[in-house]
UniProtKB/Swiss-Prot annotation:
NCBIfam families linked to this entry: proS_fam_I
Species of the source: Solibacter usitatus (strain Ellin6076)
PROSITE patterns referenced in this protein's UniProt entry, alphabetically: AA_TRNA_LIGASE_II
Any GO CC annotation of this UniProt entry: aminoacyl-tRNA synthetase multienzyme complex
Protein name per its UniProtKB record: Proline--tRNA ligase
Subcellular location: Cytoplasm
Family: Belongs to the class-II aminoacyl-tRNA synthetase family. ProS type 3 subfamily.
Transmembrane segments: none
Stated role: Catalyzes the attachment of proline to tRNA(Pro) in a two-step reaction: proline is first activated by ATP to form Pro-AMP and then transferred to the acceptor end of tRNA(Pro).
Domain of life: Bacteria
Reactions accelerated catalytically: tRNA(Pro) + L-proline + ATP = L-prolyl-tRNA(Pro) + AMP + diphosphate
Gene this chain is encoded by: proS
Length: 480
C-alpha cells in the first residue's frame, strides 16, 4: 500500500493505532464482510511466531492439538443456561444449507465448550481416561457492532484449550498453570508486562465457576484483557452428561477447564511498543530480526557491496534488501514502518574500512561496528532491545498505577480517559464483587479488570461503594 503519514499518538491514539496497522502492512479492513479484517503476510508472520511459542509450551505440558467442527447445533448452547445467555447477542446462525431450511439451525462457533462437551461424553468413561488435555487452533465468529482491527473483529483467530479432570484440585492447577504460561509468553516473548488475577462475577466467562485473566496496560493507559483461563467446575460436565467411574467405583461428573488467547495479542503488542514512526516489534517476536540495506551509487560498486551484504547476511541470518528501483532512504523507511529491530547499512566506504552501520528500531541510534563482530553486536543489540522494551512498558505501567480509597477518587481519575485522547490509569481500590458496585463503575465506563493473585499493596480495606471490608485491592480501569 502507499506510504502515508502516521497520526501522532498525542493527537489521536485510536487513529495512530489504525495508521500503524495499515502502514506496517499488518492488516486491512475487509470492507465486503462487515466487521472482518484481512491479516496480511506481515501480521500473519507475527501470529505464526506466537503460535509456535504457545504450541511448544502446550506440548511440553502434555496437551494435544485437535480440531472440532465449526458448526454447532443450536440446541447444544441451550444446554448450559448461563453460557447461551452470555453469547446470545454475538451468535451467527446458519438456517439454510443446500438450498433447504435446516431442521435445526447451526451456530457458527463462538467458542467450543458445548461441542467438545458432547464428544467428551462419548470418550470419557473411566478415571483412566483422565486427564484429557486438548488444544484447538481455530477461527471463531462473534458478531461485533463496533470493531477495531486485531482488538475486536467479527471473525478472529485463536487457540482454545479444553481439559477434563477427575477432581477439582487438579482442574484448578491446570487453570493456574495455563495462566502462568500466558503471562510467560506475554512478558518474555512479547515484552508486555501483565497482571495475573481473578475476574469478578460480572466479568467471568459465561458458564464458568471462576475466570482468571492477564491484563496489560496500553500506552494510552487503557487495559487490554490479553488472555483468560477458566475453571468450569462441573457445569458443562452435567449439561452434557460427561461422567466417569472413579477409582472407588462411583459415577462422577468430570471437572473441566477452558482457556484461550487470540490475534488480539497482536493489537496489544502494537499499542504497547509502537511509536509515531510506526510498528515496533520485540526481537523475540519479530519474523525478520535484521535487514541489510546495500548502498551504492556507481554500477562498479554494486557487485562488491552486494556480495559482502549477502555474505554477512548468511553469517547472521539477516535479510538483504536488494530490490532494484528503490532508494536506500525508501528502504530504511519501509523497514522502520514494519518494525524490524535492526537495520544494517553497508556501502563502499564501509567495505573499505571493514565496518557496517547498525541502527536500532527502538532507540534510532546508529553505530559503526567491525564486520568481524557483526554477529555478536547484532545479537547483543537484539537482547538489549528485548529487555529495554519490557522495562519501558513495565515502568509505564508502574507510573500509571495509582491507589484510591473512595469511588469519587476513582471517578475523578478515570472519567476523562478515552481510547483517542488517552489519560487512562490502573486504579487499585477495594471494591466488592457485586452488581451494585459494577453498576457504579459503569456510570463512568470503567470495570474491574481483575483482582491480582499477588497483593502488592496494603491488604484488607473498605469497599469504595458499600463500605464493607474487602480482602485486597482490585484493578479498576477503562478497557478495550
Amino acid at each position: 500500500m502507499a506510504e502515508s503519514p502516521i497520526t501522532a499518538r498525542s493527537q489521536d491514539f485510536a487513529a495512530w493505532y489504525q495508521d500503524v496497522v495499515l502502514q506496517g502492512d499488518m492488516a486491512e479492513p475487509a470492507e465486503i464482510v462487515k466487521g472482518c479484517m484481512v491479516i496480511k503476510a506481515n501480521g500473519y508472520a507475527v501470529w505464526e511466531v506466537l503460535q509456535r511459542e504457545l504450541d511448544d509450551r502446550f506440548k511440553a505440558t502434555n496437551h494435544q492439538n485437535v480440531y472440532f467442527p465449526l458448526l454447532i447445533p443450536q440446541s447444544f448452547l441451550k444446554k448450559e443456561a448461563e453460557h447461551v445467555e452470555g453469547f446470545a447477542p454475538e451468535l451467527a446462525v446458519v438456517t439454510v444449507a443446500g438450498g433447504k431450511e435446516l431442521e435445526e439451525p447451526y451456530v457458527i462457533r463462538p467458542t467450543s465448550e458445548t461441542i467438545i462437551g458432547h464428544f467428551f461424553s462419548k470418550w470419557i468413561h473411566s478415571y483412566r481416561d483422565l486427564p484429557l488435555l486438548y488444544n484447538q487452533w481455530a477461527n471463531v465468529i462473534r458478531w461485533e457492532l463496533r470493531t477495531r482491527m486485531f482488538l475486536r473483529t467479527t471473525e478472529f483467530l485463536w487457540q482454545e484449550g479444553h481439559t477434563a479432570h477427575s477432581n477439582h484440585e487438579e482442574a484448578v492447577e491446570e487453570v493456574l498453570r495455563i495462566l502462568d504460561l500466558y503471562a510467560q509468553v506475554a512478558e518474555d516473548i512479547m515484552a508486555m508486562p501483565v497482571i495475573k488475577g481473578v475476574k469478578t462475577h460480572a466479568e467471568k466467562f459465561a458458564g464458568a465457576l471462576k475466570s482468571y485473566s492477564i491484563e496489560a496496560m496500553m500506552q494510552n493507559g487503557l487495559a487490554l484483557q490479553a488472555g483468560t483461563s477458566h475453571d468450569l467446575g462441573q457445569n458443562f460436565g452435567k449439561a452434557f452428561d460427561v461422567q466417569f467411574q472413579s477409582k472407588e467405583g462411583q459415577l462422577e461428573y468430570v471437572w473441566q477447564t477452558s482457556w484461550g488467547v487470540s490475534t488480539r495479542l497482536i493489537g496489544g503488542l502494537i499499542m504497547t511498543h509502537s511509536d509515531d514512526k510506526g510498528l515496533v516489534l520485540p526481537p523475540k517476536l519479530a519474523p525478520v530480526k535484521s535487514v541489510i540495506v546495500p548502498i551504492y551509487r556507481k554500477e562498479e560498486e554494486r557487485a562488491a557491496v552486494l556480495e559482502a551484504a549477502h555474505r554477512i547476511a548468511k553469517e547472521i541470518g539477516a535479510k538483504v534488501d536488494d530490490r532494484e528501483g528503490q532508494s536506500p532512504g525508501a528502504k530504511f523507511f519501509h523497514w522502520e514502518r514494519r518494525g524490524v529491530p535492526v537495520v544494517l547499512e553497508l556501502g563502499p566506504r564501509d567495505l573499505a574500512s571493514g565496518k557496517i552501520v547498525l541502527k536500532r528500531r527502538d532507540t534510532g541510534t546508529k553505530e559503526p561496528i567491525d564486520q568481524s563482530e557483526v554477529g555478536a553486536k547484532v545479537a547483543a543489540a537484539l537482547e538489549d532491545m528485548q529487555k529495554g522494551l519490557y522495562t519501558r512498558a513495565k515502568d509505564r505501567m508502574k507510573a500509571n498505577t495509582v491507589l484510591a480509597n473512595s469511588i469519587e477518587e476513582v471517578e475523578a481519575i478515570l472519567k476523562d480517559a478515552t481510547a483517542e485522547k488517552g489519560g487512562g490509569k490502573f486504579v487499585m481500590a477495594h471494591i466488592k464483587d457485586e452488581p451494585a458496585c459494577d453498576a457504579r463503575l459503569k456510570e463512568f465506563k470503567a470495570t474491574v479488570r481483575n483482582i491480582p493473585l499477588v497483593d502488592e499493596y496494603d491488604g484488607p480495606g473498605k469497599c469504595i461503594v458499600s463500605g464493607e471490608t474487602i480482602e485486597k485491592r482490585a484493578v479498576i480501569a477503562k478497557a478495550y
